[in-house]
UniProtKB/Swiss-Prot annotation:
It comes from Pelotomaculum thermopropionicum (strain DSM 13744 / JCM 10971 / SI). GO terms for cellular component: cytoplasm. Feedback inhibited by histidine. It comes from the Bacteria. Signal peptide: none annotated. Its EC number is 2.4.2.17. This is ATP phosphoribosyltransferase. It is an enzyme of class 2 (transferase). Catalyzes the condensation of ATP and 5-phosphoribose 1-diphosphate to form N'-(5'-phosphoribosyl)-ATP (PR-ATP). Has a crucial role in the pathway because the rate of histidine biosynthesis seems to be controlled primarily by regulation of HisG enzymatic activity. Its main location: cytoplasm.
Length: 289
């Protein structure tokens, strides 16, 4: 038996392949191929546009897939969310679907969009947001290059932004956020009800989420004199309690801890001053709580 899995082709492909590699899955794809090989005989991987994956999962063409919440909502796909995977093309943060207008536009708020023309790839999601805010505007589908359509072709756009740099480069300002979106591992309902496929998906989710957790953390090892241990422990942040091991024939102990990478820059000098020796920092592949 195989699990048929849809992965996004295009801007999110490289980040997705890197995540799968960290999780233990080697994906190899030939030029112009849409069917990568993978070092797991129980997986069949198909590359396609993220916009289409939820529809094919909903219809049962795929057992499961990775796509953003925005595209799941746009496709009105009735699927099972297996795991929330917070990563994007260039940052580890959620993306936003925003409404933006030209910097010099008279449009200041959502209510000013009444009777205006808006371009977007996410027509249904945008229309729903406008209805909920009592706005009657014309929403048209954009086939790409959405940012350049303001103000010459449309009054506003609803577009995905990760860092905001593209909007700024096109002299646009945000007047509203429609939603925040993260990548979802989602499954077809019938596939989810199959015990083998459910277990396979749950195992995949554990590995992918473990890989994402590891990206923000590192491990630290150090040797500490016994009389300095309490001082060292007082300044060590940790997921749980640090691991402490007595060194053979010594009054020293080995201390090991997992912590946020952003803490290391200030922590290592502090540990050294507090009496720690032989400090080693090492990367993590997966963190499974």
């Amino acid at each position: 038996m195989k699990l048929r899995l849809g992965l996004p082709k295009g801007s999110l492909q490289e980040a997705t392949f890197q995540l799968f590699k960290q999780a233990g899955f080697e994906l190899t794809v030939r030029s112009r191929s849409y069917f990568p090989s993978v070092n797991d005989p129980e997986l069949e991987v198909v590359l396609m546009r993220a916009q289409e994956i939820p529809r094919y999962v909903h219809e049962g063409v795929l057992d499961a897939g990775l796509s953003g919440l925005d595209w799941i909502l746009e496709n009105e796909a009735d699927v099972v969310e297996v795991a929330d995977l917070v990563y994007a093309k260039s940052t580890p943060n959620p993306i936003r679907l925003v409404i933006a207008v030209a910097n010099d536009s008279n449009i200041k708020s959502v209510s000013d969009l009444n009777g205006k023309r808006i371009a977007t790839e996410l027509v249904r999601v945008t229309q729903k947001f406008l209805r909920e805010n009592g706005v009657n505007a014309y929403v048209e589908y954009s086939y790409g290059a959405t940012e350049v359509k303001v103000p010459h072709l449309v009054d506003a756009i609803a577009d995905i932004t990760e860092t905001g740099s593209s909007l700024k480069a096109n002299n646009l300002r945000v007047i509203a956020t429609i939603l925040e979106s993260t990548t979802k591992l989602h499954a077809n309902k019938e596939s989810w009800n199959d015990p083998w496929k459910r277990e396979k998906l749950q195992n995949l989710a554990v590995l992918l989420q473990g890989a994402l957790r590891a990206r923000a953390r590192v491990g630290l090892k150090m040797n500490v004199p016994g009389d300095r241990l309490d001082t060292i422990l007082a300044i060590l942040p940790a997921m749980k309690q640090p691991t402490i091991s007595q060194l053979v024939n010594s009054d020293w102990v080995a201390v090991e801890v997992i912590l946020e990478e952003r803490q290391v820059r200030d922590l290592i000098p502090a540990l050294k001053r507090a009496g720690a020796h032989d400090i080693i920092e090492y990367p993590l592949t997966k963190v499974i709580p």
